[in-house]
């Protein structure tokens, strides 16, 4: 039995995998598997995480990066066939500029346009023309400026697809919510991790200009946020959906940038939540959080102490505090 907590952990790992660069379909097989795992480690995964992830997920399309800074990886769950769009968060100067636009303008326009255009290419069969748009003057209102652009050849990787999951951390989570708004017939589930929100009137005014079946943000967006210390970015704007607050070990912004905002501390914490949920699928986030907070007197040892306690209960001949 899979619980919601198990799913939050799985999607956190996929959000981390969005930071892997240079993925190509050929990495799924043979000797190229090592390159796949190396790319995942470059995105922040541990050796064990990378090996397990590469065994569980296949690469659907080459890593997409464009001039706006948008970066997307597309994966397929080898067991269920589930397709996942994993959108990268802030990673370079272009993303920093997009973040600045988001904070002051309520939504990141260039990457929103790039995301729409890329998904249209994924949906359009290879060899056929995919509709594209451009954001250009003259602007007649707060969110206008979206016009038809010359069509380009489709990629076809998601031709005929539905029930797709989209996930992302930080700016990637913000864009995941955008994808769910622009492509409601394609996207079934949306997960965001420490993602900034929107100035909703400004965002709606922009997104309403896009062609297609865009209507409103869905209500089933799941927003997973670190509930420890200072997490400024996830408090920006309004993010539609349901927040899920996860207790993490408090991170130093100086010695472990970007501190509590990073995807790694959140994924590490969710690994412990996932372990508890695997033992008891009826457990809730709130209950696991209570256990973790009671596990140690210092945030720095909370996860280790909780894991040691479980090992003491379930692992034969385990001495508390052993590696």
Whereabouts are the PLM-identified features?
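Flexible, membrane-associating and regulatory peripheral segments of lipid-active enzymes
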Residues: 1-87, 285, 289-290, 294, ...
């Amino acid at each position: 039995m899979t619980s919601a907590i198990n799913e939050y952990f799985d999607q956190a790992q996929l959000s981390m995998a969005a930071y892997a660069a240079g993925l190509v379909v050929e990495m799924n097989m043979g000797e190229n598997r090592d390159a796949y795992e190396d790319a995942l480690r470059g995105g922040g995964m541990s050796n064990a995480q990378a090996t397990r992830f590469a065994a569980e997920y296949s690469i659907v399309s080459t890593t997409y990066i464009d001039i706006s800074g948008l970066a997307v990886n597309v994966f397929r769950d080898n067991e269920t066939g589930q397709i996942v769009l994993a959108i990268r968060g802030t990673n370079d100067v272009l993303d920093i500029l997009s973040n600045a636009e988001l904070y002051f303008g309520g939504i990141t326009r260039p990457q929103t346009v790039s995301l729409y255009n890329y998904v249209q290419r994924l949906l359009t069969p290879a060899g056929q023309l995919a509709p594209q748009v451009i954001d250009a003057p003259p602007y007649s209102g707060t969110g206008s400026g979206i016009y038809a652009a010359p069509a380009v050849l489709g990629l076809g990787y998601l031709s005929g697809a539905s029930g797709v999951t989209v996930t992302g951390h930080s700016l990637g989570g913000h864009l995941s919510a955008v994808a769910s708004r622009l492509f409601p017939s394609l996207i079934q589930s949306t997960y965001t991790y420490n993602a900034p929100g929107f100035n909703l009137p400004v965002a709606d005014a922009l997104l309403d200009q896009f062609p297609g079946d865009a209507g409103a943000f869905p209500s089933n967006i799941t927003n997973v946020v670190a509930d420890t210390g200072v997490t400024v970015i996830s408090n920006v704007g309004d993010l539609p959906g349901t927040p899920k607050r996860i207790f993490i070990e408090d991170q130093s912004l100086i010695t472990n940038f970007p501190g509590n905002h990073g995807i790694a501390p959140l994924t590490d914490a969710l690994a412990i939540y996932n372990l508890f949920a695997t033992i008891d699928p009826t457990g809730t986030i709130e209950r696991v959080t209570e256990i973790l907070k009671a596990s140690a007197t210092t945030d720095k040892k909370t996860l280790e102490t909780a894991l040691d306690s479980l090992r003491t209960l379930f692992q034969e001949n385990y001495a508390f505090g052993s590696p």
